[in-house]
């Protein structure tokens, strides 16, 4: 596969990314639940399949939304055969499962061009953090996992994409997760894409906070159409 840049299919976002996500990069999509992170990753996965990439989608939020992916393929006029032959889903239920997937990637036992973890930090939400020492240990473990994924992306010229929720001022587990996303994932990510809800129910604001390792302030307004994101003219 000779493709060098992988587009999201949102013209102004892809332009700001200088043509798209580069091989060897770790990209973070972050936002509150329901903001549109999965919509973006599905769009990216569909685009990857259409470009001939082998896509692994590691999903941890219940049943994988196959109908949405098939709908997107039909909208783009892409053959569904591409999905069946190039697209593979792994369901995650625990932190041990996440560690196992990353270990298999490290040992080159999983051979894909694009690997998406959605939601990457979900396995950590099941962990009960009872003291500061446990928080430090879990942060250290996640730091190691993120470092392995970053090195893997570089060594094998792959695209690795993670999604993470933002902090909600509700519970300690969300505070812990926000700490993880801010201090660990942000550090290792080459690109950071924030997806936020607005006052309008079907409108989303996409902010590029980091582009190819450099800070950014690019913002683009999008709208939700058939469960996916399109730029607003």
Model-inferred region functions:
Residues 8-20:
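Pre-Walker A adenine-sensing motif
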Residues 152-233:
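Phosphate-binding/switch region of NTP-binding enzymes
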Residues 6-10, 38, 95-98, 139-142:
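A conditional alpha-helix N-cap/helix-loop micro-motif detector
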Residues 19-21, 47-51, 79-82, 106-110, ...:
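Conserved catalytic network of the ASCE P-loop NTPase/AAA+ motor domain
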Residues 22-104:
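Conserved P-loop
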Residues 64-67, 97-99, 123-126, 169-172, ...:
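Switch/connector loops and helix/strand junctions flanking conserved nucleotide-binding motifs
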Residues 1-3:
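Charged, amphipathic alpha-helical linker segments immediately N-terminal to NTP-binding catalytic cores
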Residues 103-184:
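P-loop NTPase motor core
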